[in-house]
């Protein structure tokens, strides 16, 4: 029970502009509050590059829609609004960028490159293991995408997205 859309924190878009990224709710209502109130869960979340394997906040339906990326479908609204593109770097949380750049100072230059582009519904990170990849490698991959993007590379990544979604690779 509860709202269909997720109540997630704002994300960082092109040029550092904040936007609300639409997603179907896959967690219990108040999941962010639960995370903040549970020190052990918060520690695990931060330690694992802002992902929790077997997250207790994810609902039964949520596990399914996450595995097959169905929760991401509403991001087409963000694309129509001009906040995102079909292909691009991942849309990060502001606190994630801030804290992870402290942990991985070498990532700062990569983040600057990433923020010169709109985040994407899919991208190199999404088709290369998703939640199995740590922040420092993720931003490096996203920055490399921004530097070499082209129509053909975007088509290649969109085609690689199909099996990643069908087989639910790397989803948490």
Enumerate the language-model features and the residues they cover.
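Conserved small/aromatic sequence motifs within transmembrane helices
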Residues: 1-172
């Amino acid at each position: 029970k509860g709202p269909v859309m997720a109540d997630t924190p704002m994300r960082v878009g092109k040029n550092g502009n904040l936007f609300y990224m639409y997603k179907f709710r896959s967690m219990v209502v108040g999941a962010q509050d639960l995370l903040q109130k549970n020190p052990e869960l918060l520690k695990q979340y931060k330690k694992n590059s802002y992902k929790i394997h077997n997250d207790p906040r994810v609902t039964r339906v949520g596990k399914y829609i996450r595995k097959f990326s169905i929760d991401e479908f509403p991001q087409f609204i963000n694309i129509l609004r001009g906040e995102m593109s079909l292909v691009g770097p991942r849309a990060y949380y502001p606190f994630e960028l801030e804290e992870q750049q402290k942990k991985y100072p070498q990532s700062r230059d990569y983040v600057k490159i990433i923020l010169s582009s709109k985040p994407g519904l899919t991208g190199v990170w999404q088709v290369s293991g998703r939640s199995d990849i740590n922040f420092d490698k993720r931003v490096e991959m996203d920055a490399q995408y921004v530097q070499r993007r082209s129509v053909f590379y975007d088509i290649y990544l969109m085609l690689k997205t199909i099996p990643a979604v069908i087989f639910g690779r790397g989803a948490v």
